[in-house]
Amino acid sequence: MMFCSCQSDRYQIDGFARQLEQGDTICIVLENEPERLLGTAIVHQGKFSVTGTTDTILFCRAYLSRMKDCNASFLLEPGTIALELNLPPKPSRVSGTRLNNQWQQLNDSIQRMGTELIKLASTKTPCDEATHRSKLQTIDSLHRRMSACIENTAKRNADNPLGQYIKENYKAPEFE
């Protein structure tokens, strides 16, 4: 009797780089310090591709070699990963695998709340004490929602590398 495993350890990164230039180099590195180069890809007609195998899920980052702030963090795991690299300030995106979809969902939520925070904090119109207090309560509420979003994602993923990454890298604020 012979058994074969249907679980593949192959990954494919399908990269989309419509804002980047033909011939640009994309670096794929381990996210930890010091960063370790795992591979490179060349942008051709707005796309790039990287394939390989991995027996563990790794937290990585892809970035444009000439502009490191054009980057995307992602989990390198078996399957097809879609990576959209965009020039700042447009955020890059990742999807395609279960953990990367959850990572992007977390990033989207934090980005939405962060945009609200910035909008509130940058409003310079004079206001009375009650309006000011209300604004501060809204800012505090957004901070708490952001923290809860991160902590809930960590709890839902406690048994996998996404949850472990959040646990190791996120320090929850101490609210009054």
Where are these regions (language model features)?
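Sec-dependent bacterial lipoprotein signal peptides
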Residues: 1-4
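Amphipathic alpha-helical repeat scaffolds of TPR domains
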Residues: 159-172
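A non-transmembrane, solvent-exposed segment enriched in polar/low-complexity residues
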Residues: 6-151
